[in-house]
Amino acid sequence: MKYPKLVFDVSFDERARFEAKSRGYLSNVYVQQSDGSMYPVVFYDCIRLAQDLEYEVSTGRMCVADIGMIILPEVTLECIKIAVKKLTDEGYFKRVVPRGD
């Protein structure tokens, strides 16, 4: 099996891929490393992140914070795979806490 591996809580079929790209957001995803450790990740594109921040500011919260937030130019499977591979190669996942079961 090739690592890092993407693990989706729900099927990431053609429709889900279209919806993620359209929304600019994807959650309920984990990155599994070769040692079996799983890291929760959330993907945003810049437009969706700006919209969410604008909303949060309007409510007085003043921030957007998600564990494992990764910002992409667009939320596509191709961009997700490239980003996760690069982050793994750079040691990103060694510096964050894996999901506890």
Positions of PLM-derived features:
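Short helix/strand-capping turn motifs
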Residues: M1-R95
